[in-house]
Swiss-Prot record:
Primary role: Envelope glycoprotein important for virion assembly and egress. Plays a role in the correct incorporation of gH-gL into virion membrane. Directs the glycoprotein N (gN) to the host trans-Golgi network.
Domain of life: Viruses
The protein, known as: Envelope glycoprotein M
Intravirion side: 1-12, 98-117, 169-199, 258-263, 315-346
Pfam families: Herpes_glycop
UniProt-listed HAMAP family: HSV_GM
Membrane topology: Multi-pass membrane protein
Organismal lineage: Viruses, Duplodnaviria, Heunggongvirae, Peploviricota, Herviviricetes
GO CC, alphabetical: host cell endosome membrane; host cell Golgi apparatus; host cell nuclear inner membrane; membrane; viral envelope; virion membrane
UniProt family annotation: Belongs to the herpesviridae glycoprotein M family.
Alphabetized InterPro entries for the sequence: Herpes_glycop_M
Amino acid sequence: MALSRVDVINMRIWVLSIICACLTYVNVTVHLVAVHFPNLGFPCAYYEINDMKAINLSIRNDIRSLTPQLYLNPIQLICYVVFMDICFFFILVYYIVCCVKVFSSEKTPNINQSTRDITWMGDSLSCFQFVLTMDTYQFFVTCLSFRLVTLAAFTYCLFFICFTAFTLTMITQYQSSERSFFVLKRIHPKLKGTIKYKTIIINMIELMLGFSSMVFAITICLGLGNNFYIKSSTVAFASINTFFVMSFVYSLVIELILHQYVKVQFGLHFGILFGILGLTYPILKYDSLFKTEWTVKFIVNLAVITIVCLSFIICRLIRFFMRKHHNYKKLPTTVEDLDVLEEANE
């Protein structure tokens, strides 16, 4: 059966969206590579947003325009940027593989089969959200290079919103779990192999989201701490608490809603754990420099986040290995059995 007009239009839009995503990725990658080299148009090294070695607290207004708040050290920030770019590449490969499989799949008698397949794998809306995610991430790195911490906090907030929307779209396809399961059962037989690939991609996206929630917390507090007269220790404490609230809310959403769509979802929890590990070292360096009186509170809060995250992991493991057993009864086959069933219902 030939493709319907709806299939033709949706496939053309989808292909154009993937091409746009490819061009955006090339632009972002070239930008992220160039930002690591001097004399290429970027005034400062983005990863040295807080140069703790240059701080001399015995001199008044040593930093002037930038207060040394809690933030990632240069090596951590470089690794984070490279890691995100690699993950963007794998997401792009996923779209390309799905596109090739849809075009190479044999025609079926089902109406709008290609549209149904595209919707489940990741349609034009998710691809557009992916483009916005990469663009806002590029703006964030550029703002760090120009030492515009307030604008960097704003752009990272936009990035995090776009990335959260992209994650939800990839998991739910903005449908109910029943509808998503129904579409999954009716995708093209040749696309069955992409189910495992999509599960891996979703967990990788959640891993990025879990770690990015930590970066979001300290970036927002970095912007606030450099625009208002707030103690640095208060800003650091607020960063940890913000990370705790976000990790708790996101993990709770998975256990209450999103687990109905994808059963294997451990990426967010491991991303939060990596975020805890990534935040521990800057806190130790920060505490050794400023000798804050909130050291115990910092450690206690990190311990609480770790315990809560491990609790959600245990809960996810239990629900993953737990099987629902239904006791089926034999259907009535005789008139006597039907009479007994009617009497029981009465």
